[in-house]
Amino acid sequence: DPDCQVVVTTGCTEAIAAALLGLVDPGDEVVVLEPYYDSYTAMIQMAGGVRRPVTLRAPGIGDEHSRLDVDELRAAVTPRTRFVLLNSPHNPTGTVLTPGELQAVADVALEHDLVVITDEVYEHLVFDGSEHVPIATLPGMFERTLTLSSVGKSYSFTGWKVGWATGPADLVGAVLAAKQWLTFTSGSPL
């Protein structure tokens, strides 16, 4: 429903800021895969959240990309953890999480009642036979996933700051509540 499940933002960075400011309460933990886009740390801190990093592991023999260690992901979750901030395809490594890795993230989110905030700005920039699968499409995940993206990377309009957040109405509503006080409204090309 475009009236309550979509909000347009001034680029994906604003979507990230509004999502974290709108959803994270002081002391909430946010699991984030590192290395990561530099605004993640600043926005988690601005929201009063606590960053719980999980380091992607360097490529092994026969693998071109870094990999998620599922045991480390599970170990990062504590009773204060409320969110997983996901980025796949990943900036800066280029890693595209495998279906098995995505399912592991989904399993952890479902098991611990976590919300997944997924930054998918590189969803159309996938190479070497990899396939981007939105985590929101996995069973049980739409209800707990906020998907963020923009036209900047996918359509080579990096200066045209048009982004969005999509997901269930309660999550999008929280983004909208914070976004209203960041830029009030986003520009339009017309």
Regions found by a protein language model. Give the residues of each.
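Active-site phosphate-binding strand-loop segment of PLP-dependent enzymes
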Residues: 52, 56-128
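Short hydrophobic alpha-helical segments of the AMP-binding
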Residues: 23, 30, 43-44, 109
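A short helix->loop->beta-strand "cap" motif at the edges of active sites that frequently abuts
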Residues: 28, 49, 111-115, 141-143
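Phosphate-binding glycine-rich loop
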Residues: 1-29
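Conserved core segment of the aminotransferase class I/II
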Residues: 138, 142-190
